Amino acid sequence: SLSNKSAGNSVSYTKEEYETVIFDKVLLEKTSMLDTPFWNRIVQILGGVVERTTSVVAYGMGSFETKNAIVQMGCLLNLVDYLRRRNESCSVAVEIFDPVMSELDVGLVEKLGFACVKENENCKRIAKESTLFFLPHGDIFMYGNLLETNIESDTLENIILVGNGLTNYIENASRLGSGLAFQNHQEETQLSLKSICKVREILVENVVHRHRIAPPKQQIRPGATGAKVEGDKQQQGISLDGNLERAFNDTSICTFARRKQQ
């Protein structure tokens, strides 16, 4: 059984009770999200890049006893439904992994029709086909491992990345002296992400925080140097409700194009 500590009084669930209670909460988040500007913005961005996407890999959502994970799973269900509608002739395979997931979490994932990755890949999945990677609030090493693996396998263009703002991660890490850098094994040097590929990054939302200046009207965050940045500059910042804000603050969608060798 699992103790649900977030409910005030400690509640223990059996496997069946856990799957039923959390399953219902996930479906509620899934349904309520469909009417939000946040979800409409995701659909607007993904519309031109997922025509052939039939694989989804989600890392780092955590245990579904947390509210963030429940909201994020609701979003993932909507993403999968959207991909299946866009690719009616193909099935969409979904795999999920987080090392903190319990047996009850694994049971819930399977009840939802998804598969759990059996071993910790450390986010080193090669995108052999067009794959949507869902990394809400992922750590920078997760992005680094995923990108470096696909740089080495020359499969960067198969990645659609939904997660934390990548440009902010790169800039913040660089200030700390730990920026994303990738090994050039032939020349034994390190290369920055921007020197290897073009990054197209679109911010899903600008959260309006209390006691802070409202975000600018421009909805597209400047990408990495040399990046191709597109979008509707007249789009207003989207103010999320509390649950969405905590689960998806600073979310962006990135695609990548390998730079041609000189």
Question: Model-predicted segments: where are they?
Answer:
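Domain-level detector for long C-terminal conserved domains
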Residues: 1-59, 63-86, 97-262
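Short beta-strand element of Class I
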Residues: 92-95
